[in-house]
C-alpha cells in the first residue's frame, strides 16, 4: 500500500505524473484513464497492491489549504469523471485504487491528529 497522488512514493526510480488538477484542465477522459493505467502499471511492477489515490478532494474552497493540486476540480462532474477514469486505469493495471480525501480535508489543521471541524450546514450543502 502506497500513497500515490502523483505516482508511487517511497522507493527509487519512480515516475512523477501530472497532478490531478493539471490532468483535469485537459477535459480528456482518455488522459485520465491513461494516467491511472501508467500509475497502476508502475505500482504493479514494484509489487504494490493498493494505491492511495486518486484524490477526490479538496474541493478548492480553502486556497491556503495547500492540497488543492492533488484533487481534480471544484466541479463535481469533472471530479467524478476524473475519479472514475483514473480508478479504472489503476485497477485495469491490476492494482486496487483507493480514492481519498473527501469532504473537509482542505480545512484541516494539525493534520497529524484526528477530526476536522466543519460547519454542519456547509457539510450538508457539499
Which positions does each model-derived feature cover?
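Glycoside hydrolase catalytic-domain context in secreted enzymes
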Residues: 1-126
Amino acid at each position: 500500500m502506497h500513497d500515490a497522488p502523483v505516482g508511487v512514493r517511497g522507493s527509487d526510480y519512480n515516475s512523477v505524473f501530472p497532478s490531478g488538477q493539471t490532468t483535469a484542465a485537459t477535459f480528456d477522459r482518455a488522459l485520465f484513464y491513461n494516467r491511472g493505467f501508467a500509475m497502476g502499471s508502475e505500482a504493479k511492477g514494484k509489487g504494490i497492491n493498493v494505491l492511495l489515490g486518486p484524490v477526490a478532494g479538496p474541493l478548492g474552497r480553502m486556497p491556503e489549504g495547500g492540497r488543492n493540486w492533488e484533487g481534480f476540480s471544484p466541479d463535481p462532474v469533472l471530479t467524478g469523471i476524473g475519479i472514475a477514469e483514473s480508478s479504472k486505469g489503476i485497477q485495469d493495471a491490476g492494482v486496487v485504487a483507493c480514492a481519498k480525501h473527501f469532504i473537509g480535508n482542505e480545512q484541516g489543521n494539525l493534520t497529524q491528529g484526528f477530526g476536522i471541524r466543519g460547519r454542519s450546514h456547509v457539510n450538508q450543502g457539499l
